């Protein structure tokens, strides 16, 4: 049977325009469009699970939630028997970047709807760093066309750290103020320049003020373990949430200061288990805890899930199922001031609902959004037309020259036989890096890698303006044993090209290949291309289906394993090595950056 087109993508009428009709349905004066009978209602307001519940839906909104909805059933009413299964609110991802999935908003929705996600809060600061405000507008308009709720946060820090990197575009306070007038902008994206907030940087203060004046939410990003005065200054500046905590004390500190603690489980970030102890062991009120993914790889979405995976994981860490569900529904809705629209099964809200057979395992049988079934048995019921990205969003990789092996040479100080250098140390399953040091040999005047001790080379190649600039340094933690190089045009947040390799000729081949295909990620070994994921949209996203992208990404992962890299989601770790707002040591087009002091440092110690 052919899938139904997504003709229902338009949101239902506002509650105020539908109230009289909802009242009539609730009173039995008019029939519902859909009645789901005999369910166990997971009530996130009261914390109860209420058996024998019927749900009546009209015009895409809940009209009646209670026992025996026979009075709302008419000749045209569709009736579904839940058979005693759980009725759960549609899940919300409170903070995420679609681009991390390597796919478009449309493809991301196709992948996550069967997993019960019906609301997403996306921060498109990846495409903003490449295409600026027009790029944000493209993703905003695509989001509006989706059959689920995809709210957009206006990126706040483009570039993420002025003076320490150069992105493909810049956003201003005026841009933020303009975006706050767009229909689907929910607030300001994560304010990553936390030192700037604490120092009263006028750009940061201006963006936050424009957001608050618009009555919208200010997203946070405090990527520091220092909970002293800089933290207090950051909170006083206005950010309302934070997802960068990695310890229970981080979550507690944020909640005590009136922030929402967002606990993330992405493809490479495993921060829920440590922070949830603030609730399970510390007894902290869970109302101000929210679950999110931040960054999810396409393979994770296709094979493991999305917010259902996060809720399941939180339950495994000791949370009661209802509490975990609250952290992925009503808590999120209240934070974004949308509790009258989403986040619960209650009259007037959008009819976003899951039929779940096993609550602890989050086994989702059916997914409804706006009163329409979108998925059953893990498969989409509907088709979502592809969004047509213009030519201006493509061909964004501008190298300026053909790279050669010599572009990756690092000249040693004159007369040195050995040098001590700074090394970026990868931490598996975490976004921060370590600032390491290593003694490396000098061969023919050039600093050599130390493959035996897992020290290989990293290069950042400028790709927005065709300057031909290359920053060279060293990295440890990938475990590469053979001759190889991996290059990616996804390099948070400025999104130049990052190449990590043990062989300079392979490094040149990998970077040049990305220039040919318009961006993506590629792995070479001994002159041969082992895997390629093309991402022609801004050099960040594929225009193919999520399943195809996931298969290509799995081929990449397997090729990396054969080269000796056993890191969990090594590609995601690779893509963050230039993120100059998360400690400790990063690379940018400016040079090596010490993110504990926000200063450029020399490669040689």
Swiss-Prot record:
The keyword Methyltransferase does not apply. Pfam families: Adenine_deam_C (PF13382), Amidohydro_1 (PF01979). Its cofactor is Mn(2+). One of its GO terms (biological process) is adenine catabolic process. Keywords: Hydrolase, Manganese. HAMAP family: Adenine_deamin (MF_01518). It catalyses: adenine + H2O + H(+) = hypoxanthine + NH4(+). GO terms for molecular function: adenine deaminase activity. Its EC number is 3.5.4.2. It comes from the Bacteria. This is Adenine deaminase.
């Amino acid at each position: 049977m052919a899938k139904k087109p997504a003709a229902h993508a338009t949101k239902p009428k506002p509650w105020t325009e539908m109230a009289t009709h909802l009242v009539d349905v609730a009173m039995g004066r008019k029939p519902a469009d859909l009645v789901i009978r005999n369910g166990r209602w997971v009530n996130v307001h009261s914390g109860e699970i209420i058996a024998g519940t019927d749900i009546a839906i009209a015009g895409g909104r809940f009209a009646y939630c209670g026992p025996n909805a026979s009075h709302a059933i008419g000749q045209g009413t569709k009736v579904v028997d839940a058979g005693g299964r759980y009725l759960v609110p549609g899940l919300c991802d409170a903070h995420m970047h679609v681009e991390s999935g390597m796919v478009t908003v449309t493809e991301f929705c196709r992948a996550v709807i069967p997993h019960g996600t019906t609301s997403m809060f996306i921060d498109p600061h990846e495409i903003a760093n490449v295409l600026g405000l027009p790029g944000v507008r493209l993703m905003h308009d695509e989001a509006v066309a989706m059959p689920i709720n995809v709210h957009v946060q206006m990126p706040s820090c483009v570039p993420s750290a002025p003076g320490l990197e150069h992105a493909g575009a810049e956003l201003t306070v005026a841009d933020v103020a303009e975006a706050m007038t767009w229909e689907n902008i929910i607030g300001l994206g994560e304010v990553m320049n936390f030192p700037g907030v604490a120092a009263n940087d006028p750009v940061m203060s201006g963006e936050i003020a424009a957001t608050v004046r618009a009555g919208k939410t200010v997203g946070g990003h405090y990527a520091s373990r220092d909970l002293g005065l800089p933290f207090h200054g950051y909170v006083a500046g206005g950010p309302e949430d934070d997802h960068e905590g990695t310890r229970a004390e981080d979550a507690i500190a944020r909640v005590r200061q009136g922030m929402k603690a967002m606990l993330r489980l992405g493809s490479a970030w495993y921060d829920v288990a440590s922070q949830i102890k603030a609730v399970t062991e510390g007894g902290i009120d869970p109302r101000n805890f929210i679950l999110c993914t931040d960054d999810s790889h396409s393979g994770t979405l296709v094979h493991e899930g999305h917010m259902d995976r996060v809720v399941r994981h939180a339950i495994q860490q000791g949370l009661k199922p209802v509490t975990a569900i609250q952290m992925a529904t009503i808590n999120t809705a209240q934070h974004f001031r949308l509790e009258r629209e989403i986040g619960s099964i209650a009259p007037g809200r959008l009819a976003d609902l899951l039929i779940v057979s096993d609550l602890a395992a989050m086994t989702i049988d059916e997914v409804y959004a706006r009163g329409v079934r979108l998925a059953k048995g893990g498969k989409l019921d509907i088709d979502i037309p592809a969004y047509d990205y213009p030519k201006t969003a493509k061909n964004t990789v501008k190298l300026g020259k053909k790279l050669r092996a010599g572009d990756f040479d690092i000249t040693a100080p004159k007369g040195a036989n050995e040098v001590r250098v700074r090394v970026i140390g990868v931490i598996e399953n975490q976004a921060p890096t370590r600032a390491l040091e290593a003694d490396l040999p000098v061969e023919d005047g050039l600093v050599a890698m130390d493959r035996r001790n897992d020290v290989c080379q990293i290069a950042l190649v400028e790709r927005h303006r065709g300057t031909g600039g290359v920053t060279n340094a060293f990295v440890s933690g990938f475990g590469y044993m053979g001759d190889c190089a991996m290059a990616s045009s996804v390099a948070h947040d400025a999104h130049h090209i990052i190449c990590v390799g043990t062989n300079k000729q392979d490094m040149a081949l990998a970077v040049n290949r990305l220039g040919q295909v318009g961006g993506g990620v590629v792995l070479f070994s001994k002159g041969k291309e082992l895997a390629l994921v093309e991402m022609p949209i801004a050099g960040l996203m594929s225009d193919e289906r999520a399943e195809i992208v996931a298969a290509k990404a799995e081929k990449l992962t397997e090729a990396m394993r054969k080269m000796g890299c056993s890191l969990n989601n090594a590609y995601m770790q690779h893509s963050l090595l230039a993120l100059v707002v998360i400690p400790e040591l990063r690379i940018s087009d400016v040079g090596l950056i010490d993110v504990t002091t926000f200063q450029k440092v020399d490669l040689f110690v």
